[in-house]
Amino acid sequence: TCLHNKRRNDFDAYGESWLESVVRTKDNLNYNSVYIPYQFPPSYNAYRGGVPTKETEECLKYVLALAKICTPEDMYIDYAYFYPFELDEADIDEVNNRAANAERMLSEGGDVDQMLALAVERLKSDDEFAALREKYGDEFADRVLDSILKIPTLFTNVNFMGDWVDNYTADFCPYLSVFGSGRVTEHYASEAEKKNSEVWAYTCVGPVYPYPTFHIDDYNLGTRISGWMEKCYGIDGYLYWASTNGHNSLEWYKYVNQYEDSTRYVGADGDGYLVYPGKYYGSDTPLPSLRLV
């Protein structure tokens, strides 16, 4: 895809077309992640009254389907991750009790961990997976089951939240600017090592200059050195929100002319999109922004 070729892994497929998209892009040299396209609602519970909720059953469809197309050569489940953006920036945004929901869902043994444990139990008694075990062996099958339990859940924060880092099983994804302190960087790294997890970073409306951004009004130097900074700080992944947004945040119901209106979020022109519609100029593929150079 256009974004893969620019070293960006996007997610744009849902439902039945999702697995097809995963398989189709696996041979791209820049392929490195598989977004599981289930969005946890703010009130998500793995169980209710001792019975898996309908939300859990819906999420399991994706997890189990991905696990059952794995082979020793193509371990798709190793690339999988969740991104529950209903929990975004829970440290500053109390919409829908985000902080409380994050604690319930992401604490060790919380609702996400319970859902993944159920996925493993379902696979163990699944006939298709039993056939994979017979074909590829116990070592392969056990690796798939272990990988399911380790599927990361990205959790974005604006600030360093030490208690959360210590007690949640999420893969933390704070603002890139948080890593300016050696103490903070070491804390993230230490906890990630203990939990066999990763540390990500992200940028969106913030942080702003002098931190590197993908904003149109920033120097292009920023887009180039952000990767260097991530390497320096030992950051494993980078999240950008978002790459194909066609709405102004003040009018979500209304598309904008993307060649005339640079604003998706006030005060951060360029945030929310990294490509332009190619059809406008007769192209069947999106046209990448110079910010992707």
Show which residues each predicted segment covers.
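A short acidic, amphipathic alpha-helical/loop segment
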Residues: 164, 183-192
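Flexible loop residues that form catalytic
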Residues: 39, 177, 243
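Generic beta-sheet signal
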Residues: 156, 175, 202-204, 240-241
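Aromatic- and carboxylate-lined catalytic core of secreted/periplasmic carbohydrate-active enzymes
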Residues: 211, 226-293
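Glycine-enriched alpha-helix->loop->beta-strand junction motifs that scaffold or abut catalytic
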Residues: 166-172, 194-200, 234-237
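Active-site clefts of carbohydrate-active enzymes
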Residues: 195-223
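Short, glycine/acidic-rich beta->alpha junctions
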Residues: 177-184, 217-223
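Aromatic-lined carbohydrate-binding surfaces of glycoside hydrolases
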Residues: 1-169, 207, 247
